[in-house]
């Protein structure tokens, strides 16, 4: 088992902490933007570890991580830096790492717990990617989304709302408390809902087929040795 398999598990753990612990605490004021940014940075670095087995992929992801961290921390510490650029870089990072992680999960061989966790991490990365895409649209076209009670949300607070909205859309729950009004926003929502329907079915079928292929190969090897 390669070290990158352990990287998949580490990526999932950090994603889960960021999404389900740090993000809500940051929204209610218990964990500040510094803590949220720190865990986001750790998640970015773990993404590099998760793809470290492929040098070219690790280099590309490393450049993305360095760019995203520079823009994010420059904005946090000095107030400089574009929030739109930060969102775009984070979106690209999530998409690229999700694609590389899935390639790792679907490679030949036994399906380990680490690879299953990698598949879950890829699913969470897709949800995060769309959250950043929604944030970008909302920043470029104010009013693209309608929030509960028609209240106005500050730019810095958009991402917490869109993380929630993204995963509600991805799991096709659709509570309807946040509504997409801009055509581009609606298109993104439709695409994410389709991914939410297709991803689990395709993932399960592929993992089962890989495990069966591996078992058949083991049986064939035993027969040859016997």
Which role does the model predict for each range below?
Residues 156-218:
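Pore domain of cation channels
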Residues 16-19, 37-49, 96-99:
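Central hydrophobic cores of alpha-helical transmembrane segments in multi-pass inner-membrane proteins
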Residues 55-66, 83-92, 111-122:
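Cytoplasmic-side transmembrane-helix entry/capping segments in multi-pass membrane proteins
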Residues 97-143:
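Pore-domain transmembrane helices of cation channels
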Residues 24-40, 60-62, 83-95, 160-163:
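Structural signature of hydrophobic alpha-helical transmembrane segments
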Residues 1-13:
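N-terminal membrane topogenic signal
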Residues 25-28, 127-164:
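Outer-pore turret/helix-boundary of cation channels
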Residues 20-34, 47-55, 77:
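Short, hydrophobic transmembrane alpha-helix segments
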């Amino acid at each position: 088992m390669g070290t990158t398999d352990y990287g998949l598990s580490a990526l999932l753990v950090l994603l889960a902490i960021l999404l389900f612990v740090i993000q809500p605490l940051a929204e209610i004021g218990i964990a500040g933007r510094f803590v949220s940014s720190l865990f986001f940075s750790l998640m970015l670095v773990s993404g590099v570890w998760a793809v470290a087995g492929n040098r070219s992929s690790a280099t590309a992801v490393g450049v993305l991580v360095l760019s995203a961290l520079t823009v994010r921390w420059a904005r946090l510490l000095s107030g400089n830096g574009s929030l739109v650029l930060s969102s775009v870089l984070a979106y690209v990072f999530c998409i690229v790492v999700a694609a590389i992680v899935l390639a790792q999960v679907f490679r030949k061989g036994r399906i380990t717990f680490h690879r299953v966790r990698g598949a879950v991490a890829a699913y969470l990365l897709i949800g995060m990617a769309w959250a950043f895409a929604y944030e970008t649209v909302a920043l470029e076209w104010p009013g693209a989304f309608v929030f509960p009670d028609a209240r106005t949300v500050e730019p810095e607070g958009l991402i917490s709302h869109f993380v929630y909205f993204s995963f509600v859309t991805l799991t096709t729950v659709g509570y309807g408390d946040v509504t997409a009004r801009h055509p581009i926003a609606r298109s993104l929502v439709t695409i994410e809902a389709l991914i939410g329907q297709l991803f689990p079915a395709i993932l399960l079928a592929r993992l089962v087929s890989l495990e069966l292929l591996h078992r058949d190969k083991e049986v064939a090897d035993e027969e040859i040795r016997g």
